[in-house]
Amino acid sequence: MAQDLLLEIGVEEMPSAYMPRVLKDLKDLAQKNLAEARLSCGEVLTLGTPRRLCLWVKEISEEQEDSLLENRGPKKSIAFDANGNPSKAGLGFARSQGVDFRELQIREVSGVEYLFAIKKEKGQAAEQILPGLLLKVIHSLSFPKSMTWSYYQTRFARPIRWLLAIFGDKNVEFNIENIKSANYTYGHRFLSTGVLLVTSIDDYFRVLREHYVILDQAERKKMIWQQVQKVAGEAGGKAMENEELLEEVAFLVEFPTAFYGEFSPSYLDVPPEVLTTSMIEHQRYFPVYNNEGRLLPGFVGVRNGTDYCLDIVRAGNERVLKARLEDALFFWNEDSRKSLEEMSAKLKNVLFHERLGTLADKVLRLQKLALFIGQQTGLGQPEKLQRSALLCKADLMSNMVYEFPELQGIMGRYYASGSAEEPEVAEAIFEHYLPRFAGDKLPSSAGGIVLSLAEKMDNLMGCFSIGIKPSGSQDPYALRRQALGLVNIILDKKLSIDLKLVFEQAYLGYKDIDLEKSREDSVKELLDFIYQRMRGVLLDNGISYDVVDAALSRPSFDLFETYYRAFKLQEFKKSPVFEDFMVVYNRVHNLSRKWESEEIDLDLLVDESEKNLCQKLPGLQEDIKKSLIAQDYTRALELLAALRADIDQFFTAVMVMVDDERLKAARLGILKSIANMFNSIADFSKIV
């Protein structure tokens, strides 16, 4: 009869950021190891709090499935003597396998016959397998950072304090260092005392709840959000949903209780982003807003415990937040006394990168590159682009951004507005960092778009030119994110821009620096890197992999043109004339792929079908060229598909690979001319 398995790893408080990943890994490792152990099971669940990781596997089979072991022995020619009797080698193999020679089988492997011993191995009881299996699962868990404790060698995210393991109604016995698995657990650190005996899996969940532990993280999240909404509503406001904060708080507490706190309205003079950053990033509070979306002088915090002495908890949290907001107000007032130009003057004292100069050097590069991109795209006014680039890094010298680095750009916009800079300049200063993370908004103003592209292209070129590029999971300079941001901006804004030209210009910005790589190598590597991101974007947008391969195989440095062409190819693939199109392509491509010349000696052509086809080529080539310039890819594709009848007639009437070399060359020239029209759109040999 199948039984449930429960494992609880009791630990010191785990970092909340580790929890989602480790619970997923725990589930995956359990499923993988159970399958490898030939133990069938039902649903696998992982639950967790800061102090415990729980694995619950339903309906594990009582014993392993039986298995067949196949061991290969000597060749048949060696296993038998000349008279067909078992040789010493054959008998020795049977003896080593513990089977009678007559039970051996003869099987062919790669044309050679061998002896095989087929043995049935009976599965072991699950309770014999599980101790080693659970040990393996626990030791296989990995973390961003791990530690040892006491004098032990085991590494884990935090010290392991207890282990509970139950299979059905029995303990699963194993130990890690001096910690032995048992049938007891512990409740809430402050609201429960002593050991809690667990007699069954059902009993485990009941006991924890009675001792102030809500084990299911999904239930805790739901409780927290309901309480936060209720508390904020009672204070006359509302909390904005923040999934990331909600998940983090859920993994900080075992028994959540929300409370409302207040701060002085005078702090509302500080930009709201500063206040919410203090509340969310530093204190894990939920800011409270009125119905118009304006920040109120209050917050909702979540306590790890009951409502006992909640007023004292509230007062303590208000004191901590007040200290932070007092600092923020001071920074705001101090920074507001300086202009952005004063701050910008200090950039010469700060390194952008030890091998790429100072931030002041970077600003000069951005000014030149922004002008160049503005000319390429027709976006922005030169003087405003220059001004935006000059001031875009100035807020890095402010007290506020030094204290709150995540507010770079945001504070720059406020300081620019306070310094009477034009609105377009202030907006570009903020937007040049966009997008900052996956799913973030893209820049929308002309200056913001240009400066954001310049920022990312300069960063990418600088890193690639000194040999810094992502490898595996390592990407310390977030180059993948910046490249993807660049791609998304270009596609979203439908910008036609020659990336090769702009990257070459970006390289020139580093002309006074001793770079590791040449301009040609740097630009080539960067374009390859960008098109790897482009490939992912195309696939994510529903373009089939073969169409993506076909479109990307034709060199183009215009990302939007490539995207639009791939989209039209995908659309055309569903067209009723697509079959005609591919027939024409395959017939001309297969014969002409090794032929280079489009030269055709008209005097050598003898059949009307080849003369007719040849006469159509100049007009067709001109029409295809015009269609590609106009990016009317559908028309170009349909024109080529319309050649089906002419191509069929051509191949019916003439033989291309004739003995007459000059005639063969003329006919291959016709086919190559047609093939090259296909190749000017995409590499259709990739289509499946």
UniProtKB/Swiss-Prot annotation:
Q: Which reaction does it catalyse?
A: tRNA(Gly) + glycine + ATP = glycyl-tRNA(Gly) + AMP + diphosphate
Q: Where in the cell is it found?
A: Cytoplasm
Keyword Metal-binding belongs to the record: no
Coiled-coil positions are none
Which Gene Ontology BP terms does the record give? arginyl-tRNA aminoacylation; glycyl-tRNA aminoacylation
Where does it sit, as one GO cellular component term? cytosol
Q: A Pfam family for this UniProt protein?
A: DALR_1
Q: Does the keyword Aminoacyl-tRNA synthetase apply?
A: yes
Q: Which InterPro entries match?
A: DALR_anticod-bd, Gly-tRNA-synth_bsu, Gly-tRNA-synth_heterodimer
Gene3D superfamilies, per database record: Isoleucyl-tRNA Synthetase, Domain 1
Q: Which GO terms describe its molecular function?
A: arginine-tRNA ligase activity; ATP binding; glycine-tRNA ligase activity
SMART domains named among the record's database cross-references? DALR_1
Q: Where mainly found?
A: cytoplasm
Q: How does it assemble?
A: Tetramer of two alpha and two beta subunits.
Q: Into which family does the record put it? A: Belongs to the class-II aminoacyl-tRNA synthetase family.
Q: Which PANTHER family match?
A: GLYCINE--TRNA LIGASE, CHLOROPLASTIC_MITOCHONDRIAL 2, GLYCYL-TRNA SYNTHETASE
Provide the protein name: Glycine--tRNA ligase beta subunit
The opening ranks of the lineage are: Bacteria, Bacillati, Bacillota, Clostridia, Eubacteriales
Q: Which gene encodes it?
A: glyS
